[in-house]
Amino acid sequence: MSRFNQKSARPMAQPKTRVTGPAVNHEGGPGFTNSSLGELYNLSVVNFVGQDTFYEKGDARDARYNGLVESVSTGDWPWLSGLLPWLRSEANIRTASLTGAAHAVHARLAAGQYEGNDTLIDSVIQRADEVAEFLSYWRITFGKSLPQAVRRGLGMAIRRLYTPRAALKWDSSARGLRMADVIELIHPKPLDAAQEALFRYLLDERHHGDGNPELVRLVAARKAWYAASDQDKLAALANGSAFKSAGLTWENASSELKARVGEKALWEAMAPHLPYMAAIRNLRNMDEAGISYAASAKLAARIADPQEVENSRQLPYRFLMAYLQAPSDRWKQALEEAINFSLKSVPELPGRTLVLVDTSASMHSQGFSAHSKATPAMAAALFGGILAQRNPGRVELYGFADGVFKHDVKRGEGVLSTVKKFTGRIGEVGHGTQMTQSIRRVYNGQDRLFVISDMQCFSDGTGRMLSNGEGFYGGGPQPIPVADSVKVYGVNIGGYSKTAVDTRVKNRFEFSGLTDQVFGQVLALEAGFDEKWPWMQ
C-alpha cells in the first residue's frame, strides 16, 4: 500500500546496556529510561508509521522515532547503518525503514557527513514502488531539492528494481509520482539496452499515452491478454501464463473478470499461482466464493509446504491474522503447520520456564495498525503458545492484568487454537498491569522467566521493577527473590520510551517485537554468549 506516493500528499507542518536510569512510565508506575540506541531499537521494530497506540498518538510517536534516528545517525553511524537495512530485510518492516533512512541522510548531510548515505538509501529500498515512496516522503518532508546523495541512492535502486514486471505491477496513474516522473527527476543511467527500452516506453506512455508495447515483451503480452475473450483470459490464468508471461496480478484479474465469470471460477483459476502472501491474505475471499474442496486442498498443501513457508519470509503473526480472517477448518491445519515451519528457531529449553503474557487494556483495545485485527495481546499469546508447544510440560503459561490466570496448553494442541483459547480469557483478571505483584504470585523457582508486555506497568508501591540489584527487584526486602543466575527476558511489544526491564544488571534482557529472531537470541544467551544486536550476530 502506498503511504506517501499519493496525489493528495502535501508537505508536513546492542551493547548490553539499553537503559540509563529510573523513570516513570505512562501509567505512573516505576520504570527505566532507555538509552537512545535501546529506545530507537525498541521503537523501530514495533513501529507502524502514523498509527496511534494506546498511550501515544501517531504523530508524537513518529516525531520521537525521527528525532532518535537523526540523533543516532550523526553520533553512531555504524550502528544505524546496520539497524535500518536489517529492519527492512530481516524484520521485514517497510515504512519505518524508508522514513528512517530519509531522516538519517537528511541529518547527516546537514552535519557535513557524506559517506555511505547513498548506500543506505539503496539498502532499504527492496521493491520498485519504494523508490517513489522514498522520493515522495523526502519531497513532502524536506522539500523538492534533491541532494546528490539522494539521487545516487535512488539511482542505484532504480537500476536494480525497475523491470517490465515491476512496471506492470506498480506503475499507475493513481500514484502521485509515476515511474517516468521518477526517471526524469533522478536521471538514472540504464543498466542495459533492455532497461533503456523500458525507460523509453514508460516516458512515452506517461507523457503521450503512446508507448510502444513491442519495446517491452511483457507489456505486449499484457495487452494481448486484455484483448482476449473471457474464456481465454480464464484459461491463461488457470495455466499460469497470464501471471508468468503477461505479468498479471490477482488484483488486475479480479478487476477485469470477477463481474463476468463469477468469483468461484476466478479464484479456482488463480489459486495455484497466487504469491504466497496473497494466498494467505485471500483465504476468506476464497471461502466466500465457495471454491471447491479439490481447489482448497491443493492450496492448503501449498500453504503448509516447508519450502514455500521459508521462501515467503512471513512473520508469525501473518499466519495468525490469516486464521482470524478465515477460521474455517479447511485452512486451519495448513496454517498451523505453516506457523510451526516459520519458527524453526524456537528453542527447546531445559528445566522449567515461566511465561507471563500481559492481558491489560493497552494490549487488547486496538490492533497493531488501523487495518489489523491482530492485537498486541494476540501476538503475545502467540509467542507464549509457541514456547509452550515446543516445550511440552516444561512451560507454565499465565496471563496477567490486575491478577493472574494459568492457561494449560494441551500436548499436541495447535498454536493458533491455543491463542484463540487464551485470548478468549482476556478480562478474566481485570484490565490493569500489575506486573510485579503478578510475578510474586506465580514465580516459585522456575529456571527462567519471560514477560511479554508493552512494559507500562502500574506502581506496586515499592518503586521496584525488573531489576536485580539485590535479588530480583533491587533494594529492600525480597518476598520472592530471583537469583542473579536466573535469566529474565522481557519481550517489549510497545516500543514506548520507558520500559520495565533494567538491562544494566546481570541476566536481565529485553527484546523488541515478535520476530523469530528473538528465539535465536534466547538460544545464544542460554548458551552463554553475550547479548548482541541482531544484525551483529
Question: Where would I find each of the regions flagged by the language model?
Answer:
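Long lumenal/extracellular ectodomains of secretory and single-pass membrane proteins
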Residues: 2-373, 389-537
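Metal-dependent nuclease catalytic cores in nucleic-acid-processing enzymes
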Residues: 378-394
